């Protein structure tokens, strides 16, 4: 075996371990959400691939919904963050950083403090937290966005993010930008517009 071949084997082994670490973080997220008392699936008792009604008790309970694009954009942003902070490090290491951040958010988002904040400051009056299925899929959507961003030119990734924001903003009067704005600095005018 040559030195180059040994080096490639080490890189592949390290990448595999980092990907396993990503799965371990996701498993830990699932365990913590379970210990927090989150439901595995929608209280309705069935699973939908798509929940198209944003202002419903089924939102954030199924495989995907109008907030899935926000999690894809998280992946775009976390790829950029990893590129800045971990330049020269393996893609799998940057994905691990992104997975840790997203999983931490998914856990925080499902605490009573954040659920109550959503209900008091935003139009999400029917929001009672995510099902474990939905939260897991949100993290996988982030990973998908991360991998998309790793393959596309920056300009294309930015264009996709803007298109997703405009589309969801038009369709349901909510998106990642408005979600962050209303959580951090609620505005009555925005809340009234979102209420339709």
Curated annotation (Swiss-Prot):
The chain crosses the membrane at residues 16-36, 66-86, 152-172. GO terms for cellular component: plasma membrane. It comes from the Bacteria. Keywords: Cell membrane, Membrane, Transmembrane, Transmembrane helix. It is found in: Cell membrane. It is a multi-pass membrane protein. The keyword Iron does not apply. Its main location: membrane. Belongs to the UPF0314 family. This is UPF0314 protein Smed_3089. It comes from Sinorhizobium medicae (strain WSM419) (Ensifer medicae). The lineage of its organism: Bacteria, Pseudomonadati, Pseudomonadota, Alphaproteobacteria, Hyphomicrobiales.
């Amino acid at each position: 075996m040559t030195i180059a071949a040994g080096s490639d084997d080490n890189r592949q082994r390290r990448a595999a371990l980092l990907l396993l670490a990503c799965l371990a973080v996701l498993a830990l997220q699932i365990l913590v959400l379970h210990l927090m008392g989150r439901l595995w699936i929608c209280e309705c008792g069935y699973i939908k691939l798509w929940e198209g009604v944003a202002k419903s008790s089924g939102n954030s309970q199924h495989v995907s919904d109008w907030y899935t694009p926000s999690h894809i954009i998280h992946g775009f942003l976390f790829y950029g963050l990893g590129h800045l902070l971990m330049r020269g490090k393996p893609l799998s290491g940057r994905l691990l950083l992104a997975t840790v951040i997203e999983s931490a958010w998914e856990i925080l988002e499902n605490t009573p403090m954040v659920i109550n904040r959503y209900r008091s400051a935003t139009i999400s009056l029917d929001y009672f937290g995510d099902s474990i299925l939905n939260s897991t899929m949100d993290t996988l959507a982030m990973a998908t966005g991360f991998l998309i961003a790793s393959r596309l030119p920056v300009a294309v990734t930015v264009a996709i993010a803007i298109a997703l924001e405009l589309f969801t903003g038009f369709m349901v009067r909510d998106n990642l930008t408005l979600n962050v704005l209303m959580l951090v600095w609620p505005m009555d005018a925005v809340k009234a517009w979102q209420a339709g």
